């Protein structure tokens, strides 16, 4: 009775543990994989930090229009022969303590519009940094799509290889029975055994490819490698139903206004234009307004107690001197550049070169997008045609294999013919699986360039 009780406890614990493991496996669709990647990936955080830096640059350029404000206090002690400026008298062989304080402000009134243009340039740079964030996200979405479909393809190929192993093992078992009664030769057994080994090797390779693509996908999602996940399989039927032939020109025109690469290159060109305006501002005069207020104190300052008696004096107290010695200053300063050792000339020339570089980068981005879109349209049309051909090829190979097996079972075909037919059938099945997911992938690439959400209808 105790043995039965312990066995029941162990079995129940094993069942619950297995059930929890199954429940713990996370089912991930492509939309969920993209969402987790965009929420967690460090590359996006880095791009957002660069955007934050650009925002601080804009804030600083706006703040540069404001006047500065500073205050200073000086405390000095002096001994010996000197002329004291505060008391306006000569001090000899005595300690003198002086205190001075001031508050000042300075504001730039005109600087060739450099500050205003810098604000405009920094606004554009902030927009460019924002599009860089979108570009990083776009690239990650494409990487997720590639690795997701690669993992799905490898998994389905692995499942197909398991079916092929079961089929070849079944054939090996039948051949072994036929060999034992003298109906098959040793060569037939060797061929059959070789087919089992070949299929098992295919499974090992496909399993490794599946695990590698799944690991890459987890890394994009910033997910621990030990996390158990399964991927939702997309439906090919919905893709084929909506997969109308695309016009490359239409796709390109829509992609021009949606792809972050193009938007960023256009903004970078606008920044380069503003940099020319900033550089040209160096040729203009600079006008500044300064304002200051100050006061001071000296321990050597004295006053006569009696106006008629110059020998009777008293030391003027600190508060009285601070009040009496107040001073106010305001002034304008104008600096006119006459010759700056060609610095302004070089700055303008470099800014113009920067504009040419930005224009070249924009054109290059458009050219690359045009090539990619045209290639994507050709690829999706070719993928649909290849899937149709692969379907016909698999059906033909399946029929040929069944016919060869029937002939082999009655002794009308040898083991080499059966081995060849099975190999061709297996290859056709693999080609069909790859063609199927290639159609899905190529169709979603078009959605990617059009800026459409990447999502699948699941089987």
Describe each PLM feature range.
Residues 45-49, 62-63, 95, 109-137, ...:
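Sec/SRP-type N-terminal targeting helices
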Residues 22-70, 74, 80, 225, ...:
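Bacterial Sec-pathway N-terminal export signals of envelope proteins
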Residues 23, 79, 215, 431-459:
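Acidic, low-complexity, intrinsically disordered peripheral segments
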Residues 72-107, 234-243, 277, 290-336, ...:
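Small/polar, glycine/serine/threonine/aspartate-rich low-complexity segments that form flexible
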Residues 1-31, 38-41, 457-459:
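Bacterial Sec-dependent N-terminal signal peptides
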Residues 179-183, 408-412, 449:
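A short glycine-centered flexible hinge/capping loop motif at secondary-structure junctions
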Residues 25-147, 287, 342-345, 355:
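Short flexible linkers and secondary-structure junctions
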């Amino acid at each position: 009775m105790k043995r039965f009780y312990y066995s029941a406890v162990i079995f129940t614990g094993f069942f619950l543990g297995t059930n929890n493991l199954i429940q713990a496996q996370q089912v991930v669709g492509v939309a969920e994989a993209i969402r987790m990647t965009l929420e967690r990936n460090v590359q996006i955080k880095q791009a957002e930090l660069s955007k934050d830096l650009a925002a601080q640059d804009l804030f600083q350029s706006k703040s540069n229009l404001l006047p500065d404000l500073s205050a200073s206090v000086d405390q000095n002690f002096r001994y010996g022969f000197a002329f004291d400026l505060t008391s306006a008298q000569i001090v000899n062989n005595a300690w003198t303590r002086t205190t001075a304080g001031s508050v000042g402000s300075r504001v730039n009134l005109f600087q060739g519009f450099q500050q205003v243009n810098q604000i405009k340039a920094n606004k554009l740079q902030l927009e460019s940094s924002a599009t860089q964030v979108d570009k990083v996200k776009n690239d990650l979405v494409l990487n997720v799509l590639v690795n997701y479909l690669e993992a799905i393809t490898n998994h389905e190929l692995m499942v197909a290889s398991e079916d092929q192993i079961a089929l070849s093992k079944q054939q090996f078992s039948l051949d072994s029975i036929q060999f034992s009664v003298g109906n098959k030769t040793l060569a037939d057994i060797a061929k059959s055994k070789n087919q089992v080994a070949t299929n098992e090797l295919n499974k090992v390779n496909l399993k490794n490819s599946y695990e590698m693509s799944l690991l890459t996908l987890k890394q994009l999602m910033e997910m621990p490698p030990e996390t158990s996940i399964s991927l939702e399989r997309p439906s090919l039927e919905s893709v084929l139903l909506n997969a109308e032939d695309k016009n490359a020109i239409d796709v390109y025109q829509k992609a021009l206004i949606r792809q972050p690469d193009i938007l960023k290159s256009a903004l970078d060109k606008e920044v380069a234009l503003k940099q020319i305006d900033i550089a040209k501002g160096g040729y203009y005069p600079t006008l500044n307004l300064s304002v200051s207020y100050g006061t001071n104190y000296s321990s050597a300052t004295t006053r006569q107690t009696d106006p008629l008696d110059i020998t009777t004096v008293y030391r003027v107290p600190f508060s009285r001197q601070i009040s009496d010695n107040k001073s106010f200053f305001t002034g304008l300063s104008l600096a006119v550049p006459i010759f700056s050792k060609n610095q302004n000339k070089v700055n303008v020339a470099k800014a113009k070169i920067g504009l040419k570089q930005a224009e070249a980068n924009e054109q290059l981005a458009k050219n690359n997008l045009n090539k990619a879109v045209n290639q994507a349209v050709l690829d999706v049309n070719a993928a649909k045609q290849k899937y149709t051909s692969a379907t016909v090829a698999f059906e033909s190979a399946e029929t040929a294999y069944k016919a060869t097996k029937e002939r082999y079972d009655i002794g009308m075909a040898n083991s080499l013919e059966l081995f060849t037919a099975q190999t061709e059938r297996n290859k056709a099945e693999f080609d069909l699986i790859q063609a199927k997911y290639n159609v899905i992938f190529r169709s979603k690439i078009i959605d990617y360039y059009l800026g459409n959400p990447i999502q699948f209808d699941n089987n």
